[in-house]
Swiss-Prot record:
GO terms for biological process: Mo-molybdopterin cofactor biosynthetic process. One of its GO terms (molecular function) is cyclic pyranopterin monophosphate synthase activity. The keyword Phosphoprotein does not apply. The gene is moaC. Its EC number is 4.6.1.17. This is Cyclic pyranopterin monophosphate synthase. Substrate binds at residues 75-77, 113-114. Pathway: Cofactor biosynthesis; molybdopterin biosynthesis. SUPFAM superfamilies: Molybdenum cofactor biosynthesis protein C, MoaC (SSF55040). Gene3D superfamilies: Molybdopterin cofactor biosynthesis C (MoaC) domain.
Length: 161
């Protein structure tokens, strides 16, 4: 197993030095879901929620969150994102909203944290907009499913997609 990179020889937290890394095209894909009561899902699908377009607002929230990741995660590098796509879909069994985010950059460090942050905030936005009608919503399954670029090459979670 590799060692933790965010600690120095004294065991103190530090931001990893990426200055000597090559600038490469990097991609990360993350996903997660929020389960809910069937009536809540019907409200989202119908577009009649009194707060507005739940999925549209969650999509924008995810994009905005990806751009703020380094402000939220203390040792995360601020990076220049070149593309962020937030895909939201619904399912009947179990009643849920699935979120899949693709984030891209050309840089010296990966873009996984931005993709993961976008998923979390998009799902939190669904929760926030629907909590008045459903306190039983549960978020889960947030994970990285693809990473490419950089010296570690391409990694894919088996069975994802």
């Amino acid at each position: 197993m590799s060692t933790l990179t965010h600690f120095n020889a004294k065991g103190e937290a530090h931001m990893v030095d990426v200055g000597d890394k090559s600038v490469t095209h990097r991609v990360a894909v993350a996903e997660g879901h929020i389960t809910m009561e069937p009536e809540t899902l019907a409200l989202i699908r119908s577009g009649t929620h009194k707060k507005g377009d739940v999925l549209g607002i969650a999509r924008v929230a995810g994009i905005m969150a990806s751009k703020k990741t380094s402000e939220l995660v203390p040792l995360c590098h601020p990076i220049s994102l070149t593309h962020v796509e937030v895909e939201l879909s619904t399912a009947d069994s179990p009643p849920s909203v699935h979120c899949r985010v693709t984030a891209e950059t050309r840089g010296q460090t990966g873009v996984e944290m931005e993709a993961l942050t976008a998923v979390q905030v998009a799902l939190l936005t669904v929760y926030d907009m629907c909590k008045a009608v459903d306190r039983f919503m549960t978020m889960g399954g947030v994970r990285l499913v693809h990473k490419s670029g950089g010296k570690s090459g391409t990694w894919d979670l088996k069975g994802s997609g």
